[in-house]
Amino acid sequence: ELLPPLPQGVMPSYIQYMDTIQKLEKQGIKVKISDISDAMNLPRPGVTRTVKEMEAKGYLHKFASKEDGRVTYIAITEEGKKLSQKYDKDYFWELACSLGDISEEDADCMIRTIEKFYQIMCERRKEYDKR
């Protein structure tokens, strides 16, 4: 809700998928559906469906492995890279510039608060897992 509006037909998950694919590629991984599923902790059928949607819209391209034609890899198209650039890097660059007025003291306080919140959530999760 706080991000800039996406183009018609583009789901917020598309940006998350492309971010995940780029992160995996930077690690030297040739990305497959299973890699996205594992990295995002999502079920494979849902990932498969979203990847098909993104491919149909021109944001992703699937291609067969040269070594094993049964293996299919996924890459971001130029159109996908443009979308990712606009709604990721540009947005966060503008946001970073806007956050420049936050003092070091305020930033440290925020970090402590987030860390405390995370610790509480982890403890609650452990309690739920025991049930």
Range-by-range predicted roles:
Residues 1-20, 117-121:
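N-terminal amphipathic alpha-helix
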Residues 13-17, 32, 79, 106:
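N-terminal positioning helix adjacent to the helix-turn-helix/winged-helix DNA-binding module
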Residues 19-26, 88:
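Short, locally clustered residues in the helix-turn-helix/winged-helix DNA-binding domain
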Residues 52-109:
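Charged, amphipathic alpha-helical coiled-coil/dimerization segments
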Residues 105-131:
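C-terminal regulatory/oligomerization modules of transcriptional regulators
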